[in-house]
């Protein structure tokens, strides 16, 4: 959401220089960010070129079932469905060709671009009613955004393969999500040309009914929303306990990220300034957790508008 190879053969140094741009961060802890839910004054290229960030989550695939039974996208200011999408009745999909170069730019810098599915319930509908629906969505998203080969003409980003999916289910119902996660992981094995990731963004009250622990334990990392949730918010009395519970509950093989608001301007509850967040991150570091991975910010545009909030956070990671 990472790159971890060391080469010692002298003859490969020139190739390494080309493959690993100077832009790339080398800190052990990572910073992930959501992009696409606000206006696009801060472009995807801006985010990709910002050395603060290691992973970009595209927000959002907001509905699992929309026009023609296909998902609905609500990412940035795209131009509506393509001709082929309209013909198929997939009116919730978007022509994402304007983002293709930016996605490739991010990927060329070693920064995964991940499709986040869900969001707040007044904005999205990612509730499933059966395991079969979960498997269906995993296969549909695999074909439309990842390494699948069916429905090529409907792919929003053409032949570009995104790097994975993020589960942001806030419905308080995890039905079908375990089956969906397992199907995604099975599909990932079909394409050995690249690494795919599956992540989640549960709420901090532990455990989260929307993102059950049996799902979270299958993932690459979990970026817990320590905001909008009262006592377990950052700098609140229940924060440390929630962090420890999540770390233990997801298991040492799944990385834990501390999710935070990059601004208080969006009406969400629980924003803290950069100094307070950095103290909270230092508190987590001192816990010496085996799976602490870094931090997550909501959202890229909000961070820029808040004095480039992300730079202070990355500097502390």
UniProtKB/Swiss-Prot annotation:
* GO annotation, biological process: chitin catabolic process; polysaccharide catabolic process
Chain coiled-coil ranges: none
**Keyword Plastid carried by entry:** no
* The protein's Enzyme Commission number: 3.2.1.14
- The UniProt entry lists the main location of this chain as secreted
Any idea where the GH18 domain is?
29-317
Cellular component annotations (GO), alphabetically ordered: extracellular region
Question: Which stretch is the leader sequence?
Answer: 1-19
Which residues of this protein are catalytic? 170 (proton donor)
Recorded catalytic reaction(s): these are:
Random endo-hydrolysis of N-acetyl-beta-D-glucosaminide (1->4)-beta-linkages in chitin and chitodextrins
Residues bearing glycans? 25, 49, 169, 245
* Compartmental location: Secreted
An example Gene Ontology molecular-function term: chitin binding
Keywords (alphabetical) are: Carbohydrate metabolism, Chitin degradation, Chitin-binding, Glycoprotein, Glycosidase, Hydrolase, Polysaccharide degradation, Secreted, Signal, Virulence
Is Transferase included in the keywords of this UniProt record? no
**What family does this belong to?**
Belongs to the glycosyl hydrolase 18 family. Chitinase class III subfamily.
Q: What does this protein do?
A: Secreted chitinase involved in the degradation of chitin, a component of the cell walls of fungi and exoskeletal elements of some animals (including worms and arthropods). Participates in the infection process and directly acts in the penetration process of the host cuticle. Involved in heat-shock adaptation.
The UniProt entry, under PANTHER family, shows: ENDOCHITINASE
Query: What's the name of the protein?
Result: Endochitinase 3
Q: Which organism is it from?
A: Metarhizium robertsii (strain ARSEF 23 / ATCC MYA-3075)
Gene symbol here is chi3
């Amino acid at each position: 959401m990472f790159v971890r190879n060391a080469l010692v053969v002298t003859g490969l140094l020139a190739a390494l220089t080309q493959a690993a741009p100077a832009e790339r961060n080398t800190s052990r802890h990572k910073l992930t960010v959501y992009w696409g839910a606000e206006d696009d004054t801060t472009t995807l290229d801006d985010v990709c070129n910002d050395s603060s960030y290691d992973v970009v989550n595209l927000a959002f695939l907001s509905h699992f079932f929309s026009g023609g039974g296909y998902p609905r996208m609500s990412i940035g200011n795209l131009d509506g469905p393509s001709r082929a999408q309209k013909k198929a009745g997939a009116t919730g999909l978007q022509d994402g060709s304007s983002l293709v170069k930016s996605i490739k730019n991010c990927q060329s810098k070693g920064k995964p671009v991940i499709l986040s599915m869900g969001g707040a319930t007044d904005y999205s509908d990612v509730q499933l009613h059966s395991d079969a629906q979960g498997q269906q969505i995993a296969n549909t998203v695999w074909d439309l955004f990842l390494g699948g080969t069916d429905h090529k003409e409907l792919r929003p980003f053409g032949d570009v393969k995104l790097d994975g999916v993020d589960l942001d289910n806030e419905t308080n119902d995890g039905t079908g999500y375990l089956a969906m996660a397992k199907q995604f992981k099975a599909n990932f094995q079909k394409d050995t040309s690249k690494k795919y990731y599956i992540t989640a963004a549960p709420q901090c009250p532990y455990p989260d009914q929307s993102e059950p622990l049996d799902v979270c334990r299958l993932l690459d990392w979990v970026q817990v929303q320590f905001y909008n949730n009262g006592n377990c918010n950052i700098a609140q009395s229940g924060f440390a306990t929630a962090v420890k519970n999540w770390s233990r509950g997801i298991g040492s093989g799944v990385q834990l990220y501390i999710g935070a608001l990059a601004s208080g301007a969006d009406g969400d509850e629980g924003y803290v300034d950069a100094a307070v967040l950095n103290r909270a991150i230092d508190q987590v570091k001192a816990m010496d957790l085996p799976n602490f991975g870094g931090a997550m910010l909501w959202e890229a545009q909000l961070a820029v508008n808040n004095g480039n909030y992300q730079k202070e956070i990355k500097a502390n990671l």
